[in-house]
């Protein structure tokens, strides 16, 4: 319509988040809002080929829905079907990465849009809620992990409390979503229009050519630094340096084995959970994964955790020098790099006795 530029397109992280967004729209109405669910993460278009971009369904869908014309430089939004683009990603580190990838896409393909005040906005939700029961009942909301960690370390000892981790928007109930949409001053944040030097900061975060500079960027991070979510308008440079950087740091931690024990965090959780439950008898992989998830507060998908268990038990040539778990069943072969392992509900495992020698009993749970 002629007033389409007054509307907002909400991008959600998957279908479950889409239903949460629709529940929230019951508060503000649907006349000026549309929703589209992203399937996973967007393509990093900065170093992608034209063929990759043209074949990417997410990017092509956004361009079609918004009415964007390829390579056109926009100075206003009057010709668009939606005049605002709202990112409604999860509040975890991967959600921050999705926000960054969207900024990277716009800056690379349609930089003029980021220069338009109020075009790009985000909807934030708590990642952790703390329920205080004593000395008085109270609920605290935290929108990032450093903020919660500071409260836990400095103030929590004065209270009797419990907490709930919100892995994604799907964790929130319909009533909670209606509460969020009823308080847009707190949950709706506008990105400040792109400033002169901010394109270089975006390039630093996403260009393959900036790998060495990115290492130095990560090295200079000061622990505890986080984005101030009380701001109504967020500078893109602040988002990159104080929120997106947390994803990059977390991605390194979960992807690079630690020099102390050669394990990644999820592998360490598997060993810890196995010792805690004294898993020295055959246990189904799917069952063991459930034990570990409960014992270690694992917040990601069950399939990834089950695959980690399988990986620690693989004994074919070219895999573990010492397999910390004993494989009982088809755990994969060298021919496929272990990808031909049977489903986790069919195979069993238990701790290798050598694991007790490798990991000091004083360090065990």
Short names for language-model regions:
Residues 1-365:
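Conserved phosphate-chemistry cores used by DNA topoisomerases
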């Amino acid at each position: 319509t002629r007033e389409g530029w007054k509307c907002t397109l909400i991008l959600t992280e998957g279908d479950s988040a889409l239903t949460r967004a629709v529940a929230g729209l019951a508060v503000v109405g649907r006349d000026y809002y549309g929703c589209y669910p992203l399937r996973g993460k967007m393509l990093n278009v900065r170093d992608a080929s034209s063929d990759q971009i043209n074949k990417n369904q997410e990017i092509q869908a956004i361009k079609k829905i918004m009415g964007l014309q390829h390579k056109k430089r926009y100075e206003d939004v009057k010709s668009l079907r939606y005049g605002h683009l709202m990112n409604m990603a999860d509040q975890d580190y991967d959600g921050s990465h999705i926000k960054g990838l969207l900024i990277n896409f716009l800056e690379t393909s349609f930089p003029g849009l980021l220069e338009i005040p109020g075009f790009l906005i985000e909807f934030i939700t708590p990642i952790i809620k703390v329920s205080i029961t004593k000395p008085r009942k109270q609920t605290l909301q935290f929108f990032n992990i450093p903020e919660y960690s500071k409260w836990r370390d400095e103030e929590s000892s004065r209270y009797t409390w419990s907490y709930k981790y919100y892995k994604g928007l799907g964790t929130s109930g319909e009533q909670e979503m209606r509460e969020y949409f009823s308080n847009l001053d707190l949950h709706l944040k506008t990105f400040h229009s792109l400033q002169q030097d901010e394109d270089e900061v975006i390039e630093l975060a996403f260009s393959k050519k900036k790998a060495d500079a990115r290492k130095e960027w990560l090295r200079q991070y000061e622990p505890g630094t986080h984005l101030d979510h009380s701001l109504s308008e967020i500078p893109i440079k602040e988002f990159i340096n104080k929120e997106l950087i947390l994803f990059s740091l977390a991605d390194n931690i979960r992807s690079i084995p630690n020099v102390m024990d050669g394990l990644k965090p999820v592998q360490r959780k598997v060993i810890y959970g196995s010792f805690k439950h004294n898993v020295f008898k055959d246990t189904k992989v799917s069952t063991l994964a459930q034990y570990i998830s409960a014992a270690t507060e694992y917040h990601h998908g069950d399939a990834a955790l089950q695959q980690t268990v399988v990986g620690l038990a693989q004994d074919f040539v070219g895999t573990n020098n010492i397999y910390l778990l004993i494989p009982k069943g088809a755990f994969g072969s060298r021919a496929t790099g272990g990808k031909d392992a049977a489903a986790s509900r069919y195979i069993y495992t238990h701790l290798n006795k050598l694991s007790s020698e490798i990991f000091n009993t004083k360090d065990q749970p």
